[in-house]
Amino acid sequence: MAVTWNDGAALTKWLKHYSSAQDILIVGDGDFSFSLALATAFGSGANLVATSLDSYADLNIKYSDATSNVTKLEAMGATVLHGVDVKDMNLHANLQLRWFDRIVFNFPHAGSHKELVRSIFATARHMLRRHGEIHVTHKTKHPYSMWGIEQLASQSSLAMVEQAAFQIQDYPGYNQKRGSSWRCDQDFAIGDCCTFKFCLEWWASDDDRFF
């Protein structure tokens, strides 16, 4: 459920860890339903940049709701980018001069995606604002518990801020997709999972970091 706060200047709307006052980059969003859940809660997508590795043509082949979700996001003012590779996204023409308060990567669930997590830490750290955070939502049962996400993050000078339980019902309309094979448009059971939050090591102990 979205929560609205009046900070005296403008209304700030929150959905769990995310607010309309933050500049948010969502990476690898499948059918873009997570980004749409945020934009809907905020009443605007102006603070969102939603990305996918897929081209627009491939996106529409893989996901039945992709066209609709992208259209809604763009109508709400979100920036939607296709063909964005996490390995060099900080050099992307539309991203290289952008800095974010939150960078979000949900469910890198396939085994090969462990290296993608390593890559996102390595590139996203260069795209964070002061006190910004990288959020990776990930399954926590074996074999995913063996990935050592905190260790992967530390290789990019990132420190864990918090490990928060993830409940998909907190994000109405979000449909987690397999993303590969002939079942790419099917949801998958997420089971036990958490959102792991990281910041640059030198901000980890700064009392003014949270907002």
Each model region followed by its residue ranges:
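Class I SAM-dependent methyltransferase Rossmann-like catalytic core
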Residues: 1-43, 206
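Conserved beta-strand signature within the Rossmann-like core of class I S-adenosyl-L-methionine
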Residues: 47, 120, 130-138
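A short beta-strand-loop structural module common to alpha/beta enzyme folds
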Residues: 47-59
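Short strand-turn motif at the edge of the Rossmann-like AdoMet-binding core
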Residues: 52-54, 108, 133, 137-141
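S-adenosyl-L-methionine
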Residues: 59-97
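Conserved proline-anchored active-site loop of SAM-dependent methyltransferases
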Residues: 97-112
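A short glycine-rich, Lys/Arg-flanked "PGG" loop and its adjoining helix->strand segment in the class I
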Residues: 113-130
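Class I S-adenosyl-L-methionine
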Residues: 140-211
